[in-house]
Amino acid sequence: MLVAYICHVKRLQIYIDEDVDRALAVEARRRRTSKAALIREYVAEHLRQPGPDPVDAFVGSFVGEADLSASVDDVVYGKHE
């Protein structure tokens, strides 16, 4: 895989476990690319993935009528008859 970089790249030195380095070398050989290119790809892919939405933690946490969102003013300010 040939990756063309339009933006500037920054040199970065990292420490990596030997077993991960070996696995990276095998995968780089298999894909006919460099270990550095694989690392750039993996990091970019990981950072592009959206994290979990914190609002999802609240789903199902509250008890009430099914249409509360339709009458939010009534719930917050009380019903005006």
Curated annotation (Swiss-Prot):
GO biological process assignments: regulation of DNA-templated transcription
Pfam (any one): RHH_1
InterPro entries in alphabetical order: CopG (IPR002145)
Keyword DNA-binding attached: yes
Keyword field: DNA-binding, Toxin-antitoxin system
Keyword DNA-binding: yes
GO MF entry, a single one: DNA binding
Role of this protein: Antitoxin component of a type II toxin-antitoxin (TA) system. Neutralizes the toxic effect of cognate toxin VapC20.
Designated name of the protein: Antitoxin VapB20
Naturally occurring in which organism (per UniProt): Mycobacterium tuberculosis (strain CDC 1551 / Oshkosh)
Gene responsible for this protein: vapB20
